[in-house]
Amino acid sequence: MNGLKSGKWDFDEEKANKAINFIENFCHHSEGRNDLLKLELWQKAIVSAIFGIMDKRTGYRQFREVFIVVARKNGKTLFAAAIAAYMAYIDGEYGAKVYFLAPKLDQADLVYDAFYQIVQADDELDSITKKRRSDIYIKEFNTSVKKIAFNSKKSDGFNPQMVVNDEMEAWQGDQGLKQYEVMTSALGARKQPLILSISTAGYINDGIYDELMRRSTSFLKGNSKETRILPFLYMIDNIEAWDDLEELKKSNPNLGVSVSEEFYIEQIEIAKASLSKKVEFLTKYCNICLLYTSPSP
């Protein structure tokens, strides 16, 4: 974070805590139970960086593109929906437009539905929200929350305060790259917009996932001049230790929280007996991007 070291950026603890407090006091689990969402330390770090690091010159948030790569079953859908809820209800942008984007409309349903379940579970949020046929509308702030599918030819009309891109590894080739460009180019009218991209690793090469990985890696190594991208890449360091639970905690920060250790032990044994299952385990639970024939038995 060279901007913090150089003094170009500030960390506003009050703004960071405001976002954390909203999520933990208004956002409920959407599956299995109705408890309030309790953020883990890694999630608090992400929320704090997004909403707490400010451009000292403008006073606005520093980061516009956030890229989170975390293994399957670590609660990323609900986490993304909770961040979107903060943007829709608390961020203070009148007339905000929040989009949940995926290649197909039914794929965008996952985070969109999690968002609406958060709203329904809280009487205060629900009382100022109307579910319409094409969107979720918050009259008090003139805010629209909508799910949309790929249409890279249509760029007019998008004026997003926030875009949530789910499972970026499934965004195919040029189509995914073009759609991402459409949404990023539409950010200009907002003072502090946010594109949140969440994913596990995948099998597709040369798509937007790979492009974001290249940019993110360069940023984290200090080799990039970019100042608006904020990556969080949770993956194992040692592929030879892929079956070690301590190593797996690096790609599964919620190990033992949202999923038990026993689940991973069972999946490891299945992977040891099947090359195809090992490839799937390495990509989806270790976040190592591989071709199908890459790993050795």
Predicted regions and their residues:
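Phosphate/NTP-binding elements of NTP-utilizing enzymes
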Residues: 1-294
